Amino acid sequence: MNQIPEALLYTKDHEWIQLHQDGTATVGITDYAQESLGDITFVEFPLAGESFNTGDTFGVVESVKAASDLYMPLDAEVLEVNDEVDAEPELLNSDPYQKGWLLKIRLTDASQVEALLKADAYAGII
C-alpha cells in the first residue's frame, strides 16, 4: 500500500508539495510514483534561479522501466535542488518524502495552492 502523508499536498502528476510559512515549498515525487517507475537511476534537475509556470516540465526521472517528465506544481522559482538525490537517485525509491525531496521553490502565486489535492483526494485517483 502506498504512503500518502496527510500533511502534504499533491498533484495529479504524482508529486507532493510541503508548504512552508515563509512562502517557500519543498517538492518531490510520491510513493506511488516511485513504485510505478521501479528502480530510479537518474534525475535531471533544473538550475537554481530558474522560474517555471504551473505544468511546465522542470526535469526528468529515469528508471530501469521508463523515463518520466517532472512537472512544476505551482508558478515558482527554484531555490535549491537536492544534491543528495543527484548523487544517489535511489533515495527517491527508499525515502521519497524525506531524504528524497527534489526541489525547494519560492511560490510566485500563492493562490494556486488551492488547486492542489489533499491526501484523501489524491488517494482517490491512485
Regions found by a protein language model. Name each.
Residues S63-A66, D83:
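Short, conserved catalytic or interaction motifs in soluble domains
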Residues M1-T57, E90, S94-I126:
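Acidic, low-complexity mobile loops and tails
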Residues Q34-E35, E77-V78, E84-V85:
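Short, charged/polar surface micro-motifs in flexible loops or helix N-caps
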Residues G28, Y71-P73, E80, K104:
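Conserved beta-strand segments that form the floor/walls of ligand-binding pockets within enzyme
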